[in-house]
Design a protein with these regions (language model features):
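N-terminal amphipathic/hydrophobic targeting modules at extreme N-termini
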Residues: 3, 8-10, 18
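Intrinsically disordered, low-complexity cationic segments
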Residues: 4-6, 24, 213, 238
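Alpha-helical and His/Cys-centered functional microenvironments
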Residues: 11, 20, 29, 43, ...
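Serine residues within intrinsically disordered or low-complexity segments
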Residues: 13-15, 19, 34
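Short, positively charged and aromatic/hydrophobic N-terminal segments
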Residues: 24-35, 39, 43-52
Length: 253
């Protein structure tokens, strides 16, 4: 809704002259408009423009969202994701999957309810065929959406090859990286591999699928999905607090 309202406001601001044209010429209204009349009519036109703008939009069948803070409470992004999960679950009901880092290995994670039954066949396939070690369960928040936690540590062995691929394809420079860049990048890449594996095993090109990557820590995975699974639409959302925390935590100006 926020996006639609923003688009509407932009259309409203760009189409003010067009609105007056419609009011005075198409409808041939011949009396003098007061400010209230003009405002009322332009608001109506705004709604008409929005309707024609969004009437052909598609609703996805499946949604994947990845974030460093899925089942891993660090800061504000956790709040953003966890508070909207219940609404998304009501609409998509177990067709939305949150992907997070498996950073609680060997310890009990109070935010994660593991299940041996959820996606069991795919989980086995992912391990045996795609070399992905994942745990599947539910996020212990209202709505309890399905969560896939991926072990990204094995990807450190392929780090240089992954960075080379990112440079050759997208000119993403990793030579001057510092701090938590490597860890975030390996998780991001692993999350992209999870989407690819799940899609190839469970879904088809007739399914409308969206992958939303939250913050710079998941950007590399979004690039990977665009290349490896072009059937999946990608969205990248930045949360400025995370960038600031990374800069401050590594004593950078």
């Amino acid at each position: 809704n926020a996006v639609l309202h923003l688009q509407g406001d932009v259309l409203f601001s760009l189409s003010t002259n067009f609105s007056f044209f419609l009011l005075t010429h198409i409808f041939r209204i011949k009396y003098y408009f007061s400010k209230n009349n003009v405002y009322f009519c332009t608001r109506i036109l705004k709604r008409v423009l929005i309707y024609y703008m969004v009437k052909d939009l598609l609703t996805p069948d499946y949604i994947f969202e990845s974030s460093w803070e899925v089942c891993n409470k660090v800061g504000g992004i956790y709040t953003v994701l966890s508070t909207r999960a219940n609404t998304l679950q009501e609409k998509f009901r177990d067709r939305i999957f949150f992907i997070g880092p498996d950073v609680w290995q060997g310890k009990e994670n109070p935010l994660f309810i593991e299940s041996d039954n959820l996606c069991a066949a795919w989980k086995k396939h992912a391990l045996e065929k795609d070399e992905l070690s994942v745990r599947v369960g539910r996020w212990n928040i209202p709505g309890e959406p399905i969560v896939i936690l991926v072990d990204f540590q094995p990807f450190f062995e392929k780090k240089n090859d992954i960075y080379t691929e990112m440079w050759n394809r997208y000119q993403v420079d990793s030579l001057h990286a510092y701090g938590d860049y490597d860890e975030a990048s390996m998780f991001s890449y692993a999350a992209g591999k999870v989407v690819e594996s799940f899609y190839r095993y469970n879904l088809t090109e007739t399914d409308k699928v969206v992958y939303q990557a939250h913050e710079w820590m998941t950007g590399m995975g979004a690039l990977y999905v665009q290349e490896a699974v072009p059937e999946v639409a990608t969205i990248f959302t930045t949360h400025a607090t995370s960038i600031g925390r990374s800069i401050a935590g590594n004593n950078k100006p």
